[in-house]
């Protein structure tokens, strides 16, 4: 098959972007200049990355890294949470959860709407990990702010244990979560591993 020069150029560009993100992730213990720029660029909604865009896809498919505890006391962290909350609550593209990679930040941070709590508040979970999944998986519909125009049927546990770095105490905290809220946690945790619900779906359909 004849080599396409346009394809070769795009492939080389993609490799450069992957190398750039790998270098950024090695910093780990502090905010990178790129992260600070994205978070400080405005006070309102953040752009939600789309898997259909090649550059966005590189970010979305990367494995996110953990925060150092000291980072949670920074103005940069607080601003990121504020802007992520505004973004997931945007009336035009409202969601029930969002992960930091979806707004261009490859850190282990998710916001989840707690339908299992009074008032159904959004709460943030840095360094989130799913520890245990109990019982049979149940099939249910899912969509994603980063996957436009599609929905799918995905099997998830309705009873899980999660661990996260508590922003108030700066200590690891373990919590049991059940029901639909457990599904949201699993969906958002997948983003931190560079995975989409479409990778696990039994079937996909257009909205």
Per-segment meaning from a language model:
Residues 2-3, 14-16:
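Positively charged n-region of N-terminal signal peptides that target proteins for export
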Residues 19-28:
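Bacterial N-terminal signal peptides
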Residues 28-207:
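Positively charged
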């Amino acid at each position: 098959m004849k080599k396409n020069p346009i394809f070769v150029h795009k492939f080389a560009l993609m490799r450069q972007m992957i190398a750039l993100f790998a270098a950024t992730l090695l910093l780990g213990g502090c905010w990178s200049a790129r992260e600070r720029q994205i978070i400080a660029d405005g006070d309102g909604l953040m752009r939600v990355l789309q898997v259909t865009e090649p550059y966005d896809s590189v970010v979305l498919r990367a494995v996110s890294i953990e925060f150092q505890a000291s980072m949670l006391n920074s103005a940069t962290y607080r601003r990121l949470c504020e802007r992520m909350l505004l973004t997931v609550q945007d009336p035009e593209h409202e969601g029930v959860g969002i992960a930091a990679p979806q707004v261009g930040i490859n850190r282990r941070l998710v916001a989840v709407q707690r339908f299992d709590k009074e008032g159904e508040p959004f709460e943030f979970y840095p360094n989130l990990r799913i520890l245990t999944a109990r019982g049979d998986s149940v099939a249910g519909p899912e969509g994603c702010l980063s996957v436009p125009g599609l929905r799918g049927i995905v099997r998830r546990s309705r009873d899980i244990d999660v661990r996260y770095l508590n922003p108030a105490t700066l200590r690891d905290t373990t919590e049991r979560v059940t029901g639909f809220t457990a599904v949201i946690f699993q969906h958002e945790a997948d983003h931190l591993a560079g995975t989409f619900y479409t990778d696990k779906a039994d079937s996909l359909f257009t909205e």
